[in-house]
Amino acid sequence: MGLFYSNFTLRGPTQLHLVEVLRSLKRTAFVSPAFNGCITLYDRESEEQNFDIIEGLGRQLTRTLNCAALAAVLHDDDVLYYWLFRDGTICHDYNSSPAYFDPNSEPKPPTGGNSLELCAAFGCPTTEPEVHQILNLDLLSEQATIPCELERHAALVRVLGLPPCSAGVGFGTIEGGFLPVEFNKITFTRVG
């Protein structure tokens, strides 16, 4: 069985402001320290990978905090989903393996994603060609330079300059004490 997690990386708000908003919404979550002007939120309810919950929370947070957010979901280390939110709306979404849940379908290349919007939202327009390449890489091809979807997410996180703990970590990872060793020294703020 592969890795499952979800999280939101927000650009703009302070950790304190996000924590206050989460408390007012009565959410149970962990929040990372700031890194390059971004913070990562690990919401307990979103960990169930219910897209309606993820989309609702993403809209609400970015509208309330007037910011951009990237919600990411890793499903069994086989599929990476993400949504880019800005100011209460979904700008675009992404699915790395759209045929994954169709047993009668051949594998298909990733759908969605918009490297220009993604780089603009996180203030790194010069990395757009690399982000475009990461999003469109077919991991089943012989030319694939990354082996699985966790590594695709980690590559996006690195190139976009997001907190490193945005890839490979979710609410359950933190709560259960299963953090990758490189993140053991991070102090996450608990909410709820």
Name what the model sees in each region.
Residues K26-Y100:
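Short, intrinsically disordered low-complexity segments
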Residues A99-G192:
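Long, compositionally biased intrinsically disordered terminal regions
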Residues G2, T14, D43-E45, S96-S97, ...:
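Alpha-helix initiation/capping motif
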Residues E20-S24, G56-R59, R63, A120, ...:
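Charged/polar, solvent-exposed surface patches and flexible loops
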Residues H17, V21-S24, T64, F178, ...:
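Acidic/proline-rich low-complexity IDRs
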